[in-house]
Amino acid sequence: MSKEEFMKIQTCVLKVNIHCDGCKQKVKKILQKIEGVFTTKIDAELGKVTVSGNVDPSVLIKKLLKSGKHAEIWGAPKGGSNNNQNQPNLANQFKAMQIDHGGKGGGGGGGGPANNNKGQKIGGGGGGGGGGGGGGGGGPPKMVIPQLTPQQMQQLNPQQLQQLQQLQQMKGFQDLKLPPQLKGGPGPGPGSVPMNKNPQMPNNPNQKAVKFNVPDDDDEEDFSDEFDDEFDEDDDEFDDDLEDDEFDDHPPPPNKMKPMMGGGNMIMPNNMMPNMMMPNAQQMLNAHKNGGGPGPAGGKIEGKGMPFPVQMGGGGGGPGGKKGGPGGGGGNMGNQNQGGGGKNGGKGGGGHPLDGKMGGGGGGPNGNKGGGGVQMNGGPNGGKKGGGGGGGGGGGPMSGGLPPGFRPMGGGGGGGGGPQSMSMPMGGAMGGPMGSLPQMGGGPGPMSNNMQAVQGLPAMGPGGGGGGGPSAEAPPGYFQGQVSGNGGGGQDSMPGNPYLQQQQQQQQQQYLAAVMNQQRSMGNERFQPMMYARPPPAVNYMPPQPQPHQQHPYPYPYPYPPQYPPHNGDQYSDYFNDENTSSCNIM
């Protein structure tokens, strides 16, 4: 017998039905006829037949069945020199592996401290940190695998070794307690950990879990300062264009295109008069310094996370504006927190984006304690310090240090803060619980309106001080519109007012010039009213109003019916010409 044949010898134990000696002889005879069987040993009482040889047990069973003897394997095959006795045990151990999914994660940690804003110098504080997220779900599945002894490891055939090594490399199995010969050390080979190429990082056996060595973030302050300084000068010119664009919230687009003629609510977008309204940025910043609340010189948000500062009209943060913690104070617009604690801006929160984005320091539900800026929705506490005449609360950007010839345009909502008075940057505070937009003629709702006094024209008196009565004193002798304490019709409802007509013409001319001329300054350069200046072309596509020929005041606030001018019906020949060809027929 060659060595190879000897190595292949297997011992197989079969259970065969043996009733008598005759059966025993018959079985022995059948088995010995089979090729590859060397010895047979039969225990008749137990029906146990032990066969050794180089033969497959299934062949033995087949031959016995053919002879009418039912046979089955007694236990698992026991190897001679192969030592396979432990295989069933090992299979059971693999079955016993439990896959344990991680338990539920713990609850999230509380929010961070209210004020992390290192780089914040002037503006209201940022909102408090949000609450921590809920704890993550349990970790990756853990496998509990029975401990294998080194003897058992040696008995594993290569396929099983490979399976174990694959298990070890799977995510979540790094903590398997395996003997060192299966846990690959550094170096090549299956299951080994790749060599560490970065000497600073410790060798990480968990190749899928990444740990970042990030240096402490000490330069956050420098970051915000660096950007703030870099963009400071740009802010001054952007302030005019961007800050008050249609009062910061996004109203219906048509308002930018033409003024509403009905009800006397003439909306003049603030960005249409940049250089006249904002003569220079320093005065604008000075105006901001009057903002209510502790913010030293509010209006500029310099929060840590902002790549560039946004200058707001709102005064400094109200209470909590300095600390930032209880809620983002200041004009909380670019601050992404948009008003400290959710919709109700807590102590200092500027509330929702629509509720006082530019308000100085918030306060009360959705309100702005400083009443500064253009808050669209001053809550119960709105305008505590009132925007009255540029005093008290932050007033608009124009509430302090105006050039000579301009009158301060404060809010008309009363010094003590009438019903939620709000200072518009255009002057004319918007009172009332929630008017639609800061509007400039007395119109729906208790609106107090101070139109800007244009050089060379009389100033308009207040048109119904919203709760605070008339808040800007027109100089004596000036025609004052119907002053009503609760927002009656403003001057626009009195068409016989010559000053009003002249001023409306001026406004329309300036508005049109702004539309055509975009952002160029127009205070002293264009469209000064001349003695016989014809009415400016209406912006809503109606022909001009021939006021001098009207004997009686037109009783309705909307435009006159179309009456074409006498010069050949061509109203476009001198559309932008100051010379009025239709006023005098004798040339």
UniProtKB/Swiss-Prot annotation:
Residues annotated with Cysteine methyl ester modification: 584
Annotated coiled-coil segments of the chain: none
Alphabetical UniProt keywords: Lipoprotein, Metal-binding, Methylation, Prenylation
Keyword tRNA processing annotated: no
GO MF: metal ion binding
Covalently attached lipid (S-farnesyl cysteine), positions: 584
Gene Ontology annotations for the cellular component aspect, listed alphabetically: plasmodesma
Propeptide: 585-587
Amino acid composition bias (Polar residues), ranges on this chain: 578-587
Binding residues for a metal cation: 20, 23
Family membership: Belongs to the HIPP family.
Protein name: Heavy metal-associated isoprenylated plant protein 33
Organism of derivation: Arabidopsis thaliana
Organismal lineage: Eukaryota, Viridiplantae, Streptophyta, Embryophyta, Tracheophyta
